[in-house]
């Protein structure tokens, strides 16, 4: 990830790495290989939401107009930054932009080309996942949510909205952020001109993790409780056996990291 970031064409940017109290030698490796990159070391693992919030709080407001949140298991195209920033220049209602994301091991196979959220059925999914790239995924468009793997926001917008909700310790915090943005009348845009690759596998029969799937389900139901209206929530409760079944059937196609 850091090697690809060093090659981006955008000139005015700073890389900041947040270490969520890792127990391996990540900190030592980064300090040795990238001594000029600021490293935010957290005193414990705050999860995705808490870790990113604390990394954001380390930024200086007068030096940060835009912020890109990026997972460490990614590789970026050298031109990925400006397409994410450009929409903000002409539309103040755009609060979040998100790139097209491919599987790294299969660089033409899509991992994310927009997000679907249905608060009646409880379905949350990626558009285009495991589909080969084609013209229909090359159009800028409003989308329901931006994946936390990579997205861009104005510094002030992220601060105004309060960052990630840390009641989501793992999973669905990215969906929650986008739904909060949209509830306020603002927009989330999918930007296919910006491209990154995610180091996950699209193979059938990925690693089975019961605890991981249970955490995903917990995150989903926290999401529904927060954002669904009473009728939608009743619908989701009635459909919950099918939602749970869908999550476990989806393990056949789960992402193996």
Map each language-model feature to its residues.
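Short, acidic, metal-binding catalytic loop of nucleotide-sugar glycosyltransferases
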Residues: 3-12
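Short beta-strand/loop segment that forms part of the nucleotide-sugar
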Residues: 12-21, 40-42
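Glycine-rich, basic loop-to-helix element that forms the pyrophosphate-binding segment
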Residues: 41-62
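Short beta-strand-to-loop acidic/aromatic patch adjacent to the donor-nucleotide binding site
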Residues: 63-75
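Conserved donor NDP-sugar-binding/catalytic core segment of glycosyltransferases
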Residues: 77-111, 117-119
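Short, flexible, basic/aromatic active-site loop/helix in glycosyltransferases
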Residues: 117-144
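A short, conserved alpha-helix in the catalytic core of glycosyltransferases
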Residues: 144-195
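Active-site-adjacent helix/loop segment of glycosyltransferases
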Residues: 183-256
């Amino acid at each position: 990830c850091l090697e690809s970031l060093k090659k981006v064409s955008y000139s005015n940017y700073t890389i900041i790495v947040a270490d969520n109290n890792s127990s391996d030698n990540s900190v030592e490796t980064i300090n040795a290989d990238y001594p000029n990159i600021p490293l935010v070391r957290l005193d414990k693992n705050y999860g995705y939401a808490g870790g990113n919030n604390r990394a954001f709080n380390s930024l200086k407001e007068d030096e940060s107009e835009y912020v890109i949140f990026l997972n460490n298991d990614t590789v970026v195209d050298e031109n990925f930054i400006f397409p994410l920033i450009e929409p903000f220049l002409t539309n103040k209602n755009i609060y979040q932009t998100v790139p097209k994301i491919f599987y790294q091991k299969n660089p033409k196979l899509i991992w994310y080309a927009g997000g679907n959220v249905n608060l009646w059925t409880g379905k949350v999914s990626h558009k285009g996942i495991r589909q080969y790239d084609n013209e229909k995924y090359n159009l800028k468009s409003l989308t329901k949510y931006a994946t936390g793997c990579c997205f861009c926001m104005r510094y002030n917008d992220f601060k105004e909205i309060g960052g990630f909700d840390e009641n989501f310790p793992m999973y669905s915090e990215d969906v929650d952020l986008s739904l909060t943005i949209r509830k306020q009348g603002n927009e989330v845009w999918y930007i296919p001109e910006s491209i990154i690759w995610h180091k996950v596998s699209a193979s059938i029969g990925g690693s089975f993790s019961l605890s991981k799937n249970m955490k995903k389900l917990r995150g989903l139901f926290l999401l529904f409780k927060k954002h669904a209206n009473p009728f939608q929530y009743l619908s989701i409760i009635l459909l919950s056996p099918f939602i749970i079944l869908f999550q476990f059937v989806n393990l056949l196609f789960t992402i193996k990291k």
